């Protein structure tokens, strides 16, 4: 199967990225990307300084800017799918996340710092809350793990993690900015990803235009671990969401 060119982890100047959303879109067109997601940070933790997305007004402006770019792509018949995303820091307070995120406004949500069993329980509580807020089940966003470090769970019980990811259809991100997290030392982890049929996708964690298309190595590693079917599962979910 010929896989599309994916980068579902991009930061703009709404957080710690260097470019405007419109500049990212224009460059992505030139690079022949097929799918991109703008996923700026949302946090009230120690790293709150990195993001302006700390109130509903700014989030509304952020989403509107993405909408304008989406309309441009559609009206000009450009074959680039742009997703409205966000990257949520799981060391943020539960109150902040629940208050500021209107779940059906987003196409894709990444979670960073899922590091313990306690964090799984914390995130599951938030997902349950979101599911009570959603008006149409089909409008629930795609969920993924940003630059996930498998090491904690590798030393303990992988089944708890895998069952959680399977239950909520949360994908694993092969992130080209963190290649150590998909190195061969984690081969046992990726065997479980394959066994549990956990979706996988690609994100570059791009903060400037220089690495918007750094998807070759992640794709090579997906093939190395024989996870092509897992990537197909993700693309099928993505297409259902988009089309």
PLM segments and residue spans:
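Extended substrate/RNA-proximal surfaces in nucleic-acid metabolism proteins
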Residues: 46-174, 223, 227-229
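Ser/Thr-glycine-rich phosphate-binding loops at phosphate-binding pockets of nucleotides
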Residues: 12-13, 35-39
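Charged catalytic cores and adjacent phosphate/nucleic-acid-binding surfaces used
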Residues: 1-12, 21, 25, 101, ...
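Residue-level marker for buried hydrophobic side chains located in beta-strands
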Residues: 6, 37, 84, 144, ...
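Short, conserved active-site loops that position catalytic residues or coordinate cofactors/metal ions
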Residues: 37-49
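Active-site metal-binding motif and surrounding structural segment of the metallo-beta-lactamase
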Residues: 26-35
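Short, histidine-centered active-site or binding-site loop motifs used for metal coordination
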Residues: 42, 113-115, 204
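Short N-terminal binding/cap micro-motifs at the start of the first secondary-structure element
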Residues: 14-18, 44
